[in-house]
Amino acid sequence: MNNIKLYKECYFKNVAVVTGTYCSGKSMVAPIVSSLSKVEHLRKLLVVDQIFHLANLRMINKESAIFLVRHYLDKSFYEQLIGRNINFRIEDETSIFTAKNTKELANRILIKRGEHVITKHIQNKTIFC
């Protein structure tokens, strides 16, 4: 059997990860981080936590976990940039109504998707939270 190596280059290099155990203050710190200049609106990506749990339990290997996380983050960040999966629930922590740039986030559903979206945010050094 051939040893297949999984590798995924990330489109986005600037990522701020707010992590910690339950009740450690993540919900208080993450909105502060996402309010900073060039930082995108807060997203909670529970799949990433689940992938790391599987890796820690040795149910998947480290190489697979890294590949899956990179792939999922790129997909999630791109979808955020084109306005896909926007949270419009007013009272939710990740709602666009709690963002510093609500109108800009809402208008993303109107932009044309494609590689130019990624290029723009790489050049602007956007930080994803």
Language model features: what each stretch is:
Residues 1-9:
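Pre-Walker A adenine-sensing motif
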Residues 9-10, 35:
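An N-terminal structural lobe/cap that precedes and organizes the functional/catalytic core
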Residues 12-15, 125-126:
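Pre-Walker A (Motif I) flank of P-loop NTPase domains
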Residues 18:
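Hydrophobic anchor at the beta1->P-loop junction of P-loop NTPases
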Residues 24-41:
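A conserved segment at the C-terminal end of the G1
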Residues 45-128:
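PAPS-dependent sulfation machinery
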